[in-house]
Amino acid sequence: DSQDFAAKVFHADKTYFVLNGSSASNRVVTNALLTPGDLVLYDRNNHKSVAIGALIQAGATPVYLETARNPYGFIGGIDAHCFDEMYLRQLAAERDPEKAKQPRPFRLAVIQLDTYDGTLYNARYVVDRIGHLCDYILFDSAWAGYEQFIPMLKDSSPLLLDLGKDDPGIFVVQSVHKQQAGFSQTS
């Protein structure tokens, strides 16, 4: 009952409580979705658990999205040109020319919705720009999880998006123990 209640509160179709934090949740999602050779759009801000789950355990092939760095070396958001379809298809073609020609060349995009350093993406923008190229998008919201409860952040919440029939499946991982009131590495 508590998972159903949480799904309702967070505006999710389903909610699963996972122990061992978002590291475990990221591996659950990536290992459920990916097989060897699948192309994955990969945000450089992603947590190591995604690299372990998606790239090592599942054997998927990364297509890295470049990120900005400030003068102090902090990684910022994904560079704007990385949301261009022609550019992404070109990157896909470098790894798998046949998949690059498919309507959805990427099995999964993994986006660090909010970074350790404070970058918070507009989820609507991400889905509108790359969603049609992906079967699924995993938004790792480990450092937030509160965006759906703050009106001015509603566009940052993948859980509040009105999705169309052509949009990808959406997964959101949250670290309830970081920014919310969860116990011991609850995700």
Model-assigned labels for residue ranges:
Residues 1-25:
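Conserved N-terminal alpha-helix of the aminotransferase class I/II PLP-enzyme fold
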Residues 8, 22-35, 39-187:
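Conserved PLP-enzyme active-site core in the AAT-like
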